[in-house]
From Swiss-Prot:
Palmitoylated. Palmitoylation is essential for plasma membrane association. The lineage of its organism: Eukaryota, Metazoa, Chordata, Craniata, Vertebrata. CDD domains: IQCD. This is Neuromodulin. It is a peripheral membrane protein. Its main location: membrane. Gene3D superfamilies: 1.20.5.190. It holds the Pfam family IQ. One of its GO terms (biological process) is cell differentiation. Residues 32-61 form the IQ domain.
Length: 213
């Protein structure tokens, strides 16, 4: 009995599943297929994205070697131009060596040029000194002129003071009665008159005395 029951139950389940399928109209297999297709599509998209990123990285890496190659080419182009001045400098040094030999006339020429340049420097110094002297002379003359003006002013002031003192003394003398010659003459005449009067009076007195006798 138990075996029969166990066998009958799954059959009932299948029937129920069939009924559900009939109602929905879709089978679980179809749902699983759809889910699988979605998963595959998403996986493919992920793979394609990775490929795109890898391609971008590869492109950048490709451009970087190209740039490095261009820079190397530029350096190679520049390096010969840099080497040329070095060669030119060595050539000029080699050319200058014979000129520096003691027996060559080129070696004797620079001292003469130096001697010529030395006198040209000395006149310039002398001219500068002369200019300084010329500039100092007007200053000295101005200073002397200023000193002379000061001395003359002082002398004039002294003279004015002396004149003022003399005028003051004269004014004082004018205020005080001076012993003029007229006054002295009048005094002398008065004295002479008095003497004459005395002389005249003496003979008269003598005559009176004689009469009395």
């Amino acid at each position: 009995m138990l075996c029969c029951i166990r066998r009958t139950k799954p059959v009932e389940k299948n029937e129920e599943a069939d009924q559900e399928i009939k109602q929905d109209g879709t089978k679980p297999e179809e749902n699983a297929h759809k889910a699988a297709t979605k998963i595959q599509a998403s996986f493919r998209g992920h793979i394609t994205r990775k490929k795109m990123k890898d391609e971008d990285k590869d492109g950048e890496n490709d451009t970087a070697p190209d740039e490095s190659a261009e820079t190397e080419e530029k350096e190679e182009r520049v390096s010969p131009s840099e080497e040329k001045p070095v060669e030119v400098s060595t050539e000029t040094a080699e050319e200058s060596k014979p000129a520096e030999q003691p027996n060559s006339p080129a070696a004797e020429a620079p001292p003469t040029a130096a001697t010529d340049s030395a006198p040209s420097d000395t006149p310039t110094k002398e001219e500068a000194q002369e200019q300084l002297q010329d500039a100092e002379e007007p200053k000295e003359t101005e200073n002397t002129a200023a000193a002379d003006d000061i001395t003359t002013q002082k002398e004039e002031e002294k003279e004015e003071e002396e004149e003022e003192e003399e005028e003051e003394e004269e004014a004082k003398r004018a205020d005080v009665p001076d012993d003029t010659p007229a006054a002295t003459e009048s005094q002398e005449t008065d004295q002479t008159d008095k003497k004459e009067a005395l002389d005249d009076s003496k003979p008269a007195e003598e005559a009176g005395k004689d009469q009395n006798v």
